[in-house]
A protein has these predicted regions:
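Ubiquitin-like/PB1-type beta-grasp interaction modules and other compact soluble beta-rich domains
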Residues: 1-76
Length: 77
């Protein structure tokens, strides 16, 4: 039973993490996933989250087999 976690751009550097699978024990939502991989590091206010490639917020429920991604806001010109 696992959730795949991916971090992109500055989130990858902030957490020193590209990709990891975590056990689903005690994981209910995106915020729990963040805490599992980040420990004491707070989630920056502008962090974007996605579950199975759909935008989600920290309260979004997750379950076994989900993919959760964290990335900074996208900018362009």
């Amino acid at each position: 039973m696992a959730i795949k976690v991916k971090c992109f751009a500055s989130m990858r550097e902030y957490l020193d993490l590209s990709e990891r699978e975590i056990a689903t024990d005690g994981i209910r939502n995106v915020a729990d996933v963040w805490q599992s991989v980040a420990g004491e590091k707070p989630m920056p206010d502008n962090t974007l989250c996605a579950v199975n490639q759909n935008q989600a917020d920290a309260k979004f429920s997750v379950s076994d087999g989900d993919e959760v991604a964290f990335f900074p806001p996208v900018t362009g010109g």
